[in-house]
Amino acid sequence: MIFATLPDHFLPGFGDNPKNARMTDRFYLNQLRIPTPDNPLRILVSACLTGIACGYDGTPYGQYPSVLKLLNYANVRLIRFCPEDYAFGTPREMCDIHGGTGFDVLDGQARVLTESGEDWTGGMVQASLKMLELAQREAVELAVMMDISAACGSQVIYAGNRFAQQKVYQIGAGVCAAQLMRHGFKVISQRDYASLEILYTKIDPEHVVNGEAIDQHETAWYQNYFGAGEKGSGEQ
């Protein structure tokens, strides 16, 4: 399955600024097919979310049970990939986007810099192309990715160095998530709990829906932080 590149204004949930991802596509999630073991749902996932030790410090980010649970289903095929490990190895420096979002990096208008100032823009773009190639080859139907990441973020990322004395967040996607979105793939984050609830209704007929689950953009932190604009200061 090969997806044509979509203009940003055709991508759902991007608000007034097409380069800023604001919400998940719940309509799409509700239309997902019911998978079977013979024809499993193909989900691309940030490898760190499944317990693989590919975090920047060589540890896994396996603290999200709502994502780890996907490993238990025979009717789900997980395609696990860490773009930063692919491009820069593990362990590695932490990196963030400076001067825009992942879309801006793809357009040559922003850079990816490590905490020590090394420019990793080229490597990150190459990693995004590798992730896109994998998604197309495997015909993935959804991507579940690590938010905040300069590579995999889909709702919120840092605006500049996350280790700055006054850290700043912004609404937007990381480089690899932006690459996938531009080519028609749907992306949700590990913090989009309402969207994950919809996903589980498709793969588990016995799943009891948590009606109080909300997505990242619906949290009090998000609403308070971004209420006056797309950037701000504070802790999450």
Where are these regions (language model features)?
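Active-site and ligand/interface coordination hotspots across diverse enzymes
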Residues: 3-61
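Divalent-metal-activated hydrolytic enzyme cores
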Residues: 21, 38, 106-130, 166-236
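Short amphipathic alpha-helices and their capping/turn segments at secondary-structure boundaries
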Residues: 24-38, 65-77, 89-91, 127-142
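Short, well-ordered beta-to-alpha junction loops that form the rim of enzyme active sites
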Residues: 48, 146-150, 192
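Short, surface-exposed acidic-centric catalytic microdomains
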Residues: 63-113
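Internal, conserved structured core segments that host functional sites
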Residues: 139-163
